[in-house]
Amino acid sequence: YSRATMQQTAPGSTFKMITAFAGMNEGVIGVNDVIQTKGYFDKTETPAKCWIYPSAHGTIGISKAIEESCNYFFYELGYRMATKDTGTYSDITGVERLQKYAGMFGFDSTSGIELPESKPQISDADSIRTAIGQGTNNFTATQLARYVTTLANSGTCYDLSLVSEIKDIDGNVVYKNEHKVHNQLDFPAEQWNVVRQGMRQVVSVHTSSSALINQINVAVAGKTGT
């Protein structure tokens, strides 16, 4: 039993970059827009709290929201995607929009790795909580790895593989593995930049690891997730 390929869990806040891309491409937030966040989101029948409640993160944009992992900011994006068409909240509308973008990042199928793997489950309920990686989202570590790789390389979503080549007993190559592209995401450069800037800030600004990370000659980015 491989935990990396079989054990599933909610991605939590690691999902928030998908919500950011969904919000930008669905036209509910611009790259440079800000949201006045509060600690308590009460625009739906099932209110939700930010992790910082009873405090709040104030007025922030996408990069800062990713850095601070502000739940309220992403609740608001989930809400806007659910109300865009009619002005009335439609949970399924918001969920379907988030499902669309999660699928683009590879969560619509197993990762391609040559091992038994659990089938990913993209959330099918609760647009507000789906937007922060909860709802019924359920993925494996390998599926999350493919998603993060897609973020890192500006939109090429590859199938994962453990096999480079296969040789026979005499050392002859009988199979040469070629990379397989699952999907190509053609988002504007400014969108990639604002999301990845937030991920960079996660590990480089006011964190317990920033002092260490800032000493190495490699640009590191990341995202918290609980």
Model segments located where?
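Beta-lactam-recognizing serine transpeptidase/beta-lactamase-like catalytic domain environment
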Residues: 1-13, 18-226
